[in-house]
Every structure is written in structure tokens, then in C-alpha cells.
Amino acid sequence: MLNNSIRVRATASVANVSCGFDCIGYAIAKPGDIVTIEKQDQPGIEISMSGIKYESIPVDPENNTAGKAILSLLDTVESKQGFKVHIEKGIPPGSGIGSSSASAAAAVVGVNELLNKPLENSELLVHGMAGEAVASGGFHADN
């Protein structure tokens, strides 16, 4: 049976731990973002949002961390599949606990699953980093 939708939760994280700045990190059980992804017949990414302080986050896929991460993944696997993406922000934007990276991570995991896992989990990081570049201006994985 083929799945047409998936719901993925990504937790907050801390990457700047004492003298282990960007080297030592950990995940936090709460809060977290919930990303619901549904296949759609037409190509493209359609993003909607709800939750904590989401109003300032762009829904244009090129300017949204989850959207950009999905576009990066789709480009790599050469897929024209379209998706509706709903991001429920549980991690406050700008809080320093991985708000942007959580949305991107959940998005690439979910899309990869809906595409029947064309990529290994280890190959997903680079696509999350493409999303993070939208928020931070840099291609890095610090959360």
C-alpha cells in the first residue's frame, strides 16, 4: 500500500554546549515541530503554517527552510513530485534551539519516506543544510 501523506516530528536541539561549541550537542524531547506532508498531483511545494510565532516565517519554498530542503532533495533524486506541507511550529523561531533545522529535518525525512526512500538517512543531512542556509545564510549543520 502506498502512502500519500506522512506526519513527522522533529525535536529541539542544543548545539552550543560549553567548550564544545558546534561539536557537542543534544536533542531535547520538548518542544518540537510537527510537519505534515501530502503528495499532490501538480508539481511544486505548497507550504502552510501554524503554531508558535509562525507569522514571520515565509511560506515561499525558496525562502522557507523546509521548502528549500525539499527542493534540494527533489533536485537530487530528479523528481517532479509535488507536495503540500503544513508546519506546526512548536519551537519558537529565533530561540536558538533549532527551530529552522527541525522543520528542515522533518521535511526531508518525510519526503524521502513518501518517495519510497531513494536516499539513505546519511544522505539527507546535506538537504537539511540547504534549508538551514535560508535561515542563517550559511551551509552548516550546527543544530
Residue ranges of each PLM-predicted region?
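ATP-binding N-lobe of GHMP and related small-molecule kinases
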Residues: 1-95, 113, 117
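Gly/Ser-rich oxyanion-binding loop with an adjacent helix/lid
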Residues: 80-143
